[in-house]
């Protein structure tokens, strides 16, 4: 079997930390206010590309530099444990990214699919590596330097897309099975309630 090509994440992308929100938060008495949608740690709940990412409203004292706003095909990584990555689709652009997150911009789309990178970063293989590098006792966080040094396995783009498609389909099937379980539990309860009356 042919060995997969690997490259460090720093060779494939640009990574920057989000904005420290307290610096831009509007004061109550401030007359200049700009309202944004902002990512929160809740934004990293299990989602797929077809859903909107959870956000909260953020009132800034002035406009925020576009480098701190999500762009299509960005991958956002939660730096506080549990470390999770989310893909930014066209539905989720222009959200403010806080300093608890890193923005990964793919600069090598000819060899790296951003959705594949998201799944790769969320894999148990990478999660185990990141756990070794977490710092802190009460609030564990990873460093951007650790992200930059991650080795990324790079199958051909076509294979990356096949992996993305498989995971998308598997997630849809899992969601459907969860819905069927919920419906079966409701039906079971209703039948039981009817029978004991």
Task: Give a label for each model feature.
Residues 9-13, 102-154:
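Basic, amphipathic alpha-helical recognition segments used for DNA target recognition
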Residues 27-36, 56, 68-70, 88-100:
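Short, surface-exposed loop/turn microsegments at beta-strand edges and helix-strand junctions
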């Amino acid at each position: 079997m042919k060995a997969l090509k690997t490259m460090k994440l720093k060779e494939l992308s640009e990574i920057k930390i989000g904005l420290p929100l307290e610096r831009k938060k509007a004061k109550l008495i401030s007359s200049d206010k700009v309202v944004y949608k902002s990512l929160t740690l809740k934004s990293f709940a299990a989602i797929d590309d077809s859903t909107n990412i959870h956000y909260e409203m953020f009132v800034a004292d002035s406009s925020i530099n576009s480098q701190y706003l999500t762009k299509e095909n960005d991958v956002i990584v939660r730096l506080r444990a549990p470390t999770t990555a989310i893909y930014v689709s066209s539905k989720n652009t222009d959200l403010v990214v806080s300093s608890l997150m890193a923005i990964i911009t793919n600069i090598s789309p000819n060899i790296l699919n951003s959705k594949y990178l998201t799944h790769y970063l969320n894999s148990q293989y990478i999660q185990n590596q990141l756990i070794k590098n977490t710092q802190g006792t009460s609030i564990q966080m990873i460093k951007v330097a650790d992200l930059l040094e991650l080795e990324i396995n790079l199958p051909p783009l076509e294979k990356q897309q096949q992996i993305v498609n498989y995971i998308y389909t598997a997630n849809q099937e899992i969601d459907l099975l969860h819905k069927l379980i919920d419906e079966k539990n409701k039906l079971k309860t209703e039948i039981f309630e009817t029978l004991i009356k």
